[in-house]
């Protein structure tokens, strides 16, 4: 039996691709219904007014308006505020 592993072989060299998570629309940015605002694992940011929560915890806009991030009782929350029509 050989006591040394054959040369030219490697056990490393593989990795999974990044999942492209994070905030997709910034505070104050304009969104339309269906726009993804945050992609996340778990609810790091909680849904607020006029946003929906997907089964993979993606937060998306339900109405047309501007994105607003805020903190309430140690929870980060994202809302979409309706733009006042003139």
Curated annotation (Swiss-Prot):
One of its GO terms (biological process) is translation. Belongs to the bacterial ribosomal protein bL27 family. Residues 1-22 are annotated as: Disordered. One of its GO terms (cellular component) is ribonucleoprotein complex. NCBIfam families: L27. InterPro entries: Ribosomal_bL27 (IPR001684), Ribosomal_bL27_CS (IPR018261). SUPFAM superfamilies: Ribosomal L27 protein-like. It comes from Rickettsia peacockii (strain Rustic). Gene3D superfamilies: 2.40.50.100. Keywords: Ribonucleoprotein, Ribosomal protein. PROSITE patterns: RIBOSOMAL_L27. GO terms for molecular function: structural constituent of ribosome. This is Large ribosomal subunit protein bL27. The gene is rpmA. PANTHER family: LARGE RIBOSOMAL SUBUNIT PROTEIN BL27M (PTHR15893:SF0), RIBOSOMAL PROTEIN L27 (PTHR15893). The keyword Ribonucleoprotein applies.
């Amino acid at each position: 039996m050989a006591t040394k592993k054959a040369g030219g072989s490697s056990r490393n060299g593989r990795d999974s691709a990044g999942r492209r998570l994070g905030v997709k629309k910034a505070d104050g940015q304009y969104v339309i219904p269906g726009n993804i605002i945050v992609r996340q694992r778990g609810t790091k940011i909680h849904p607020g007014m006029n946003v929906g929560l997907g089964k993979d915890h993606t937060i998306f806009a339900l109405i047309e308006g501007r994105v607003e991030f805020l903190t309430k009782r140690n929870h980060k929350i994202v809302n979409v505020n309706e733009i006042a029509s003139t």
